C-alpha cells in the first residue's frame, strides 16, 4: 500500500488538490498501462511466420494506406489497423492467401473504433475486388477479436 501512495505522490504531487486531476486513479491507470504493454507484438514476430515475410507485410501496409486515404479515414485508424495486424501476427501464423483478408478485417475493426462513419462490410469486399465475401470479413473480424481477447488498443511506444 505504501508503494501505491508513493507512486501517486511522485506522479501527481503538483495536482493533488485539483479534483479534475482525479489523482485517486493514478495507481490504477498506471497498472492498466503496464498490463497493456504486455499485449504489444513480439519484436521478431515475423520470424514466427512460415508463409509470409516482411516484404509481404509491407505491401499489405502500403495497400491499406491507399485504402485509408481513399475512404478519407482519420490518421489514428491506420495506426490502429497496423497495430491490430502486428498483434495478431505476433500470436498466430497466417497463410499468404489470407493476409489481405487480415488487413481488411483489421481496418474494419479499427474504423469502427476510430471513425464516426466507418465503412460497411460491403465496402471491405469491394476494396479486395471481391476476393473475399462479407462473411469472410466478418469471420476474420471475430477471429481477430477473439485472439486479441477483445482488447483493441495497446500502447504503441
Kindly label every feature range from the protein language model.
Residues 1-101, 110-157:
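Acidic, Ser/Thr/Pro-rich regulatory low-complexity segments at or just upstream of the first helical elements
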Amino acid at each position: 500500500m505504501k508503494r501505491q501512495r508513493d507512486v501517486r505522490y511522485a506522479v501527481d504531487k503538483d495536482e493533488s488538490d485539483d479534483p479534475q486531476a482525479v489523482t485517486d486513479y493514478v495507481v490504477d491507470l498506471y497498472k492498466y498501462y503496464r498490463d497493456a504493454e504486455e499485449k504489444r507484438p513480439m519484436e521478431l514476430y515475423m520470424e514466427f511466420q512460415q508463409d509470409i515475410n516482411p516484404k509481404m507485410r509491407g505491401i499489405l501496409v502500403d495497400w491499406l494506406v491507399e485504402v485509408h486515404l481513399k475512404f478519407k479515414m482519420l490518421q489514428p485508424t491506420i495506426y490502429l489497423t497496423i497495430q491490430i495486424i502486428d498483434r495478431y501476427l505476433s500470436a498466430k501464423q497466417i497463410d499468404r492467401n489470407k493476409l489481405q483478408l487480415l488487413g481488411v478485417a483489421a481496418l474494419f475493426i479499427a474504423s469502427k473504433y476510430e471513425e464516426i462513419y466507418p465503412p460497411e462490410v460491403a465496402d471491405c469486399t469491394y476494396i479486395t475486388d471481391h476476393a473475399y465475401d462479407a462473411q469472410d470479413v466478418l469471420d476474420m473480424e471475430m477471429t481477430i477479436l477473439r485472439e486479441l481477447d477483445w482488447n483493441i488498443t495497446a500502447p504503441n511506444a
